[in-house]
A protein has these predicted regions:
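Catalytic core of pol beta-like nucleotidyltransferases
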Residues: 1-33, 41-48, 57-115
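Structural signature of the urease/amidohydrolase superfamily beta/alpha-barrel
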Residues: 52-53
Length: 115
């Protein structure tokens, strides 16, 4: 397979992945928000592009257990980095430079409306 064909196939997978991520995470009890940030959210599409995913999940699980659960659930066939905060952690981190940058550039995929 040529590099161009490989790139085209990977870009197709990249472009299908956000919908799949939403399908999987919207079913998970307690997930309140899912967004993309980073190179994909900024429009980059090549073999070096990964998906940077921010998840806000209302759960009592510890951070490593949250991440382990999310990575095992999110089988999307592309490179992916996941950041997961509880709602309290998300509120606490909003004023920190990293999360401020993420929120400026994010593409919101899913947000649970308050009941």
């Amino acid at each position: 397979m040529s590099v161009e064909a490989e790139r085209a196939a990977y870009v197709q997978k990249l472009d299908r992945a956000p919908r799949r991520i939403v399908e999987l995470l919207a079913q998970l009890d307690g997930v309140e928000r899912v967004s993309l940030f980073g190179s994909y959210a900024q429009g980059r599409r090549d073999l070096f592009t990964d998906l940077d995913v921010l998840v806000v999940w209302k759960t009592d699980r510890a951070l490593l257990e949250r991440l382990r659960s999310l990575y095992s659930l999110l089988d999307v066939a592309v490179d992916m980095d996941v950041i997961c905060y509880t709602p309290a952690e998300f509120e606490e981190m909003k004023d920190r430079p990293f999360l401020r940058q993420v929120l400026r550039e994010e593409v919101l995929l899913f947000e649970k409306k308050p009941s």
